[in-house]
């Protein structure tokens, strides 16, 4: 029964995200009544100010807060490479800048990419937004897309856009998996119901992090009603030592399961060391946590780049 439940949950996550990222070109109605536009219909919504570019002259740029060592940034990098493959772009048509802080360095990187001929430029960190908006104002012929941002609708800059997925939905399902594990631990007598305490390692107390942890907790409570959750912030998107320390502190305080919204492998590795179940983000942690990895939530960002 447990294996069947786990399989059904995995299928639910698969179809949930497949539905968000389907490449089907047919126009249809979703179950919630919203229309899924075909590629042809989407093209009609593109502003006339966006100029068409020949494929062999097209360039795309990506600005990352960290590099491949960050699970979050690596997800963007690998997604862009997947999009490159799908679109048939050459290596010199894809430019990636890594370790670009949430400072004027971001504007400089964006300007350099624009000067290098990029037609579309992505930036992946919340704190990049104001600098990307500045660049968008100075390079009106370049499209700037910012992940996790909030200002595109109000800024009214024609070539500035926000792009991300509703990851809180995936976090809810990941929370269900966590709740199933807690219930299993209670039913087996490993813990009592009042000890079903989750630890959550967050990067910052931003709305994106708070909405994600809230969805995760609601998912867990939908299965394990006695579940409670402790949250700690590292005040950094990527810090292996801080994230590991935060996870260890939560475990030492009585948390029997750990999840995270931070970008390193610190928390999953702490869980494996302490034999505590872990729900991860951005990557599968099965290889580094063969005894403790439960499930991960991840966005297929290649669809955004395409």
Locate each region found by the language model:
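Bacterial lipoprotein signal-peptidase II cleavage site
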Residues: 19-30
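Extracytoplasmic "Venus flytrap"
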Residues: 36-54, 59-79, 83, 96-106, ...
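Periplasmic-binding protein-like
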Residues: 62-63, 115-126, 143-147, 252-264, ...
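An alpha-beta-alpha
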Residues: 80, 171-227
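Structural motif
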Residues: 92-114, 232-251
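Flexible loop/hinge segments that line or gate small-molecule binding clefts
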Residues: 140-164, 283-293
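Extracellular/periplasmic Venus flytrap/periplasmic-binding protein
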Residues: 207-254
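Conserved small/polar residues in nucleotide/adenosyl-binding loops
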Residues: 304-306
